[in-house]
Amino acid sequence: LKLHDIPNTVNKAVEEIAQFNILMTTIHLQGGAEMIEAAKSAAGNTKILGVSLLTSLDENDTSELYGNSFDDQFTKLITLAKSSSVDGIVCSPKELISLHDLNKIKVVPGIRNAQTNDDQKRTMTSQEAYAQGADYIVVGRPITQANNIEAAIEEYLA
């Protein structure tokens, strides 16, 4: 669940999410400062994580969508995150190196321990992501679509 809507709608959604004692939920940083603050004001103990750019996007996508290079768009979103009350950042492992001085939670999707042919364009292994400063990793299909889910989980924990 990645929230991205007008501030009032995001505020009400986060208010509902927070009632379930959820540890973290995500919002798109592209929703802007007012939306971020609306989410935080309703979060209670739930941490609000700001999604930077989806791991399925690359340079061509950001140029087409935002008229910016990937790096410029990422920098704009991280600058917004730094000046906001967001508790953490969701970004691909490839961008972690630029966040070493950021004192916020770092959640990293796009984790692949083997070469895959899926829609993830900016990936890294779990070990590489942790070495680059990830606090949490997100592994989806390599686990949920594995023939042996327990073995797949062990592979990512190793």
Task: Give the ranges of each region predicted by the language model.
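Catalytic-face loop-and-helix region of soluble metabolic enzyme cores
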Residues: 109-122, 139
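Conserved anion-binding
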Residues: 5-97, 102-105, 112-116
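Short glycine-rich, acidic/polar surface loops and turns
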Residues: 95-96, 123-128
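Conserved, mostly hydrophobic/aromatic
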Residues: 2, 25, 81, 129, ...
